[in-house]
């Protein structure tokens, strides 16, 4: 079968890899270079963790995700993942922490509850002030995202995927599995896959309101030299205090410390200027002030803007439309599942998986005891 994929980010590349392995002839269209620095998935790191609050469906999917990443590491010949563990902090009774603990109990995932003093003692890069409760899990870690994307591009090219960079799609016809390029060229296939990230509503207006482009700013920090050894044992941090909370990514494999908040801007133009003003970078860094010990000793390196594609309930949209599949598994938590979603799509295309079941699974809505 001839398959045409729009978008060469992590989802498009994982779909291409899985469909190629299924024996299909795959063409990949990308509006920019490949990898595209403006893609949602092209950054130093992304996180994988079981901690999902009450969302047991997504927590269950993480085990599958780890298996699929292992398959990819074998194909790549390198493991682009660093285990860090996961630390949740928040005020006493924080719903995210209590719900995560209940889900972990149900799924048999190892964790320990910590108090503020224990957090500061075990992980001296983090400050104890303001912590009412904490949960630490040894599972979870950092996916080296930009290196993964480059590796997937190499695999796709070596496997025979036709990659067309610098090709902007003007219109999509899912019923005919056809696209019209900005220069007027028509490209058709037997099956169309649209993995266009924040550009999806422009290509398919029916998704206006179902997903919204959201400009997000992260700050990248250089830790003080005296804390570098402590950072080597520090877990990723998800903090739910102070309103919208913050995240902190350890400086894995030579990358900086990364931080930002959990809020969605729900604004911005993905074709707009990606430059981050110094004050915006400082604001993103400040989200971690309450949680990073000796915060003022960190040096702000830069800020970076990327775009999430946010659904109102933060559930992934993976669904067939005519002779096309729409892949919009984002809302800021999709990267970890990309190889699994690519595999599941290939199974559905081969008739081995029910499309409706796949859509429910991707939305995190499968029963917790489903096999």
Predicted features, each with a name:
Residues 45-122, 131, 245-246:
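Dinucleotide-binding Rossmann-like beta1-alpha1 core, especially the glycine-rich loop
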Residues 287-371:
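C-terminal catalytic lobe of FAD-dependent flavoproteins
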Residues 2-28:
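N-terminal Rossmann-like FAD-binding beta1-loop-alpha1 element of flavoenzymes
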Residues 6, 29, 187-199, 342:
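Short hydrophobic core segments
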Residues 1, 182-191:
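Core beta-strand elements of the Rossmann-like FAD/NAD(P) dinucleotide-binding domain
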Residues 21-41:
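Glycine-rich FAD pyrophosphate-binding loop
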Residues 17-21, 79-81, 191, 198-322:
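Active-site substrate-recognition segment that forms the wall
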Residues 71, 91-159, 164-165, 171-174, ...:
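Flavin (FAD/FMN) cofactor-binding and adjacent substrate-gating region
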